[in-house]
């Protein structure tokens, strides 16, 4: 009986410690030390939330930089996800031999009309990648300059200003940040 009492006491202590004290401590530390990140790294414009630095959005208008392809169409609306039963995040899981991947790559190449960056035709693992490589961004400059009737050198300068270095991969830019800055030109 004493063993059962000690076991139940330990379960109760661990429940309180792991279920309440630890999560509240981590949440409080996050809010104090990293308030922006702890709240989703939200981007606001005129006091209204327009996106997050960490989650990509679907950009279809030719006057904007387009992000990576998303197998889930950047759908983060919880109600739509619940109704459709579809995932809120996830890659396409298309292998190199999959005809659907080949078809999608060919369609993208046909739209862009030239050799393009690999991240322009492949989805990220989460399907919600907010960044594209600098090469991908530079390949979109001609289209954007034509649509906005502005000099391509201004857009290239904008890309260079927003470039973030990566020690293990290609340099990249955040698509949302780039498009917000583009609208200010």
UniProtKB/Swiss-Prot annotation:
Pfam families: KdpC (PF02669). The keyword Transcription regulation does not apply. It comes from the Bacteria. The keyword Coiled coil does not apply. Its main location: membrane. Belongs to the KdpC family. HAMAP family: KdpC. Part of the high-affinity ATP-driven potassium transport (or Kdp) system, which catalyzes the hydrolysis of ATP coupled with the electrogenic transport of potassium into the cytoplasm. This subunit acts as a catalytic chaperone that increases the ATP-binding affinity of the ATP-hydrolyzing subunit KdpB by the formation of a transient KdpB/KdpC/ATP ternary complex. NCBIfam families: kdpC, PRK00315.1, PRK14000.1. This is Potassium-transporting ATPase KdpC subunit 2.
